[in-house]
Amino acid sequence: MWQIPLFLIACTVLFGCSGESGTAVPPAQLLEHVGRGEFILYRRNGDRYPSEPIPDGTELLHGREILQTRSIASAGDRTQLIQALEAGQADARRNPEPSVDCFNPRHAIRTIDGETTTDRLICFECRNIMVWTNGEMTGGSSTSASPQAVFDSFLEKGDPRR
């Protein structure tokens, strides 16, 4: 008899958080930023939880320490990053898998266009993306881990600290 509640708990943990959160925001909207505005790629500390004490002088992005920043000025580089993200999202749609509920986003893309700032927080561990526009969560989607190598290659070319 105890197996039934255990089974229900396991199903809830495995499948309860596997769907897409909020309204999906396609990376095609990122294409608007290929030739204008700011486009910034971040590596964030996914190991420190937002509730933990923050060391003095730490720069944060949505509660997580920024480990590295790379401003992407080239339209070609922006397109390469966007296409990698689009491919990851297409992979996730073709091969849906239950995602885990970790959301420790170690990568982010910020676009700033006029008075609109949009952040895409990306966790390649649980394959989830959360989208924030002007400080409010506006959507989310899923991805595969495939874009991570492209993102990391751009970050390796950037400033080692920020």
What are these regions (language model features)?
Residues 17-162:
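Function-determining sites in protein domains
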Residues 5-14:
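Bacterial N-terminal signal peptides
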